[in-house]
Amino acid sequence: MARFVVLVIDSFGVGAMKDVTLVRPQDAGANTCGHILSQLPHLQLPTLETLGLINALGYAPGDMQPSDSATWGVAELQHEGGDTFMGHQEILGTRPLPPLRMPFRDVIDRVEQALVSAGWQVERRGDDLQFLWVNQAVAIGDNLEADLGQVYNITANLSVISFDDAIKIGRIVREQVQVGRVITFGGLLTDSQRILDAAESKEGRFIGINAPRSGAYDNGFQVVHMGYGVDEKVQVPQKLYEAGVPTVLVGKVADIVNNPYGVSWQNLVDSQRIMDITLNEFNTHPTAFICTNIQETDLAGHAEDVARYAERLQVVDRNLARLVEAMQPDDCLVVMADHGNDPTIGHSHHTREVVPVLVYQQGMIATQLGVRTTLSDVGATVCEFFRAPPPQNGRSFLSSLRFAGDTL
């Protein structure tokens, strides 16, 4: 009986990927962790420090130092860009495929027709570039925070329209388009005009709502991510189900990863609540895989708010200490990220960064896991840990973990 926890601190990268000068020059020099610690050198994250955060970062920009007891590595992104949805699919064993890129303007006609046919009131807003405005409460257009052309947003005022109805609109859009992701989200706004006032265009081809400016994150935020072309049958939850091991997803990962046979805690944003649920699930199940996402760090990155990012990291760190304290000798923990979102880089998009892979189990001897070429190595390790069939992608590093008393 054992538990394996993967905690994903959303967007907590540790340095730009080597290929950014070619594929994402706007991310050159990005380092989410490093630049936060440079601006706040006295920030203390003692649990992450012990687990090897500074080891993974590769230098000490503040008071925190490398750990002599850590098992750590870094992982490169195999998916293009830097994306939460594809990052988590990759973590859980999907081999990423090149995404379809298409501005919303290229599909606006058929999306509009499908919505009108389904009985929704649809207007076009904008001049040469246009987005859709549905039932005076929902905007549909390009996602301006992710890689342009890969994601469409449905931004709703949930004071006017129910989230269930917003999801119905999102599903109609999903049926009409082939981009990697459609995100339906909203918040409780006093005036729908706030969404319209946050409309922006980029590069003369993309138009949508600036999500942080819309106010959707501020009060009553809810979100569902609708993916394209991801096969849940080759992912970790399915493989563990075949081996009789339950999967628990907590936070944003539950919104974006299919888990039909397990427990999914969806529509959660508050970091403390997410960590409380994680610890409760950990204490409830003698055997389980638990994957938790901390989204508020990513939201702080989008808002380019270093102080907020650091404060959320402290919440995570305090609760990680509780989790480590509750662990038994057979339990394993991995702390990692899915991409970067450097709040100092000068734009509000994700940044393409390598991520830390920090591993803890009682009795473990300090080990360097090196550079993993895909996030899927974590999912492959989870499957081997539980003696389950491997996922589609990734190489397990379980055999690299060393413990006191091991013989060569």
From Swiss-Prot:
Q: Which InterPro entries match?
A: Alkaline_phosphatase_core_sf, DeoB, Metalloenzyme, Phosphopentomutase_DeoB_cap_sf
Binding-site positions, Mn(2+): D10, H302, D338, H339, H350
Cofactor(s) listed in the protein's UniProt record: Mn(2+)
> What keywords are assigned to this protein?
Manganese, Metal-binding
SUPFAM superfamilies given for it? Alkaline phosphatase-like (SSF53649)
According to the record, cofactor stoichiometry and binding are noted as:
Binds 1 or 2 manganese ions.
Q: Which Pfam families match?
A: Metalloenzyme
Q: Does the keyword Manganese apply?
A: yes
Q: Which processes are annotated in GO (biological process)?
A: metabolic compound salvage; nucleotide metabolic process
Q: Which GO terms describe its molecular function?
A: magnesium ion binding; phosphopentomutase activity
Q: Which residue pairs form cystines in this protein? A: none
Q: Which cellular component terms (GO) are annotated to the entry?
A: cytosol
Instruction: Give the family, as the similarity comment puts it.
Output: Belongs to the phosphopentomutase family.
Q: What is the protein name for this chain?
A: Uncharacterized protein YhfW
**Gene responsible for this protein:** yhfW
